[in-house]
Structures are given as C-alpha cells and as structure tokens.
C-alpha cells in the first residue's frame, strides 16, 4: 500500500476515509459527514486533547468532512479548504450551519449581540471567515450586518459578498498583518505562522495554497535564482520550515517566531540570522507570476 501524507489524507490504523479504500489499510472506512464551522475560530489539533499541539485552525463558515466523533467531544476530520486533517472540537462544528453569503475583509470583525458597537462584543471574526448575513440595521449612522440565526451583528463595511472580486495584490493583503502575533499553527489574524500568512494572503487574491511551507514550496509558482539581485515583490523565499514574502528587491515580510510577530526586515539579515541559528540556507525562491 502507498504511503500518503497524513496531513492531507485521513487515515489511521483503525479508520480511514472511504475514498482511500484500496490505497491504505485500515480496520474500517467511513464516507464522512460534511459539517460547517460555527465557532469564530476552531483549533485543529494533532491529538484529541486540549493540550495537544495546534497544527492549524479553521474559521467560521469553512466545511469539514468528519469521519469520527468521540464521547469526549472531539471530531476527527479533514478541513475541505486545504485538506488538512486533525482533531476539531465537536461543538465548533454543525451539520446545520447556515450557508455563508459574505466573507470578512477586516483583520478583526467584532461580533456584537445586536447592531450597536457600544454593546459588549461577544466574539471576533478573522479575515477570510465566511458568514451568513440576513439583513441590515443602522444605529447612530453606522450600518450593521445581521448574522443568521440571531447570532449578532457585525459592522457591514467589514464584509463583502462571497462573489465580490478578489484582491488584486496579495502582498498588500499580507502587509495588513504587520505586527500580528506569531502563533505556531495559527491561521487567523488573531495569531498566525509563516505559512498561514502566505496562505491567507493568497486566498484573498483567489489563489489556493497548501497549509505548510514544504507543501507550498512544491505547489506554488516557478523557481527563480535565489539571488538577492533577482528577487522582486511577491516572490516567496523558502527555508526548511519557513517562508517569507518579498515586498521589493530588499525587504521581506514574514511571520517570525524569532520576533514573535509579523515583521519586515532586510532579506540579507534574515538569511544571515536563520543560518546562524541552524535553519540553513534559503532552499528556493518561488515566483507566482
């Protein structure tokens, strides 16, 4: 039987995705049930425990193919946006979630219990989350979008219809994350890692990207010479386990664990520091256009 990447294929010794029958061995196979993320943000963990490693996150409105739910409140499934497999909190998912109509375009969109920003926010939606909006209301000159199911309201200007044109410049989207906190496994504007910065920014420009750096390096763009004199805006610079986005021929934007945030720094300085700390040389530069 073939060895498949467990990050992108749902299989264990005891259970596997029915679509993998004949490809991997398992005691049983399941077709899975599609559920929608109803939490603002849902953790995806390596194991069914709240203290297990955070491998990624799912945002409201995304769909998950669930293969198993445990009595302890965990759902083992696959995020359909990028194929990532892991354990989700069961209460963050619903088979009856409303079909999204809009996507969030603000870095953070607070959710209020009603159409009034003076009410205490009950949560917050990150950039790229998808929501179902059923109407509008105006309070003191500010227009609010009303969420389906009476779940509250957001400022209407912070969301656009799903069919709205994508962003033209993914680098400009990435720059909006400047100073956002670094979070290993994070995939939202509340905290994210280097590959999530690339994935989210490209998603706003209608470009699908894998979740992890090694997968991105294989899938995105074409290789160009890893030479500081030849890089330009939008190029992706990869290391083993890291990626950054070039703003121009000199400066790079990246979610840096060293700096604990999204930062801009000269590419040359990043290359020297990463090598000095044992991260090796840049492995490739990829150009999307």
Segments (PLM) and residue ranges:
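Short, basic/aromatic beta-hairpin or loop at an interaction surface
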Residues: 31-45, 98-112, 203-219
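Short alpha-helix capping/helix-loop boundary micro-motifs
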Residues: 47-53, 111-121, 218-228
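Loop/turn positions that initiate beta-strands
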Residues: 61, 122-133, 233-234
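Active-site nucleophilic cysteine motif
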Residues: 174, 186-205, 209-210
């Amino acid at each position: 039987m073939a060895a498949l990447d467990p990050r992108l294929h749902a299989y264990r010794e005891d259970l596997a995705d029915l679509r993998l029958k004949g490809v991997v061995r398992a005691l049983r196979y399941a077709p899975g049930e599609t559920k929608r993320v109803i939490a603002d943000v849902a953790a995806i963990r390596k194991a069914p425990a709240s203290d297990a490693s955070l491998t990624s996150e799912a945002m409201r409105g995304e769909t998950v193919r669930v293969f198993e739910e445990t009595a302890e409140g965990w759902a083992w499934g696959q995020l359909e946006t990028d194929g990532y497999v892991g354990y989700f909190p069961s209460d963050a998912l619903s088979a009856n979630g409303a079909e999204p109509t809009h996507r969030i375009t603000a870095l953070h969109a607070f959710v209020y219990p009603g159409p009034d920003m003076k009410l205490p926010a009950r949560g917050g939606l990150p950039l790229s989350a998808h929501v179902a909006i059923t109407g509008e209301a105006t309070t003191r000159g500010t227009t609010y979008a009303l969420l389906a199911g009476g779940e509250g309201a957001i400022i209407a200007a912070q969301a656009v219809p799903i069919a709205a044109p994508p962003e033209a410049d993914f680098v400009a989207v990435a720059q909006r994350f400047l100073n956002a906190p670094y979070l290993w496994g994070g995939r939202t504007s509340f905290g994210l890692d280097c590959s999530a910065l690339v994935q989210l920014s490209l998603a706003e420009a209608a470009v699908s990207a894998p979740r992890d750096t090694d997968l991105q390096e294989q899938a995105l763009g074409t290789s160009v010479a890893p030479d500081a004199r030849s890089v330009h805006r939008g190029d992706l610079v990869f290391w083993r386990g890291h990626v950054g986005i070039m703003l121009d021929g000199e400066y790079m934007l990246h979610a840096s664990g060293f700096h604990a945030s999204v930062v801009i720094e000269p590419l040359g300085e990043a290359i020297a520091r990463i090598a000095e700390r044992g991260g090796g040389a840049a492995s490739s530069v990829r150009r999307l256009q």
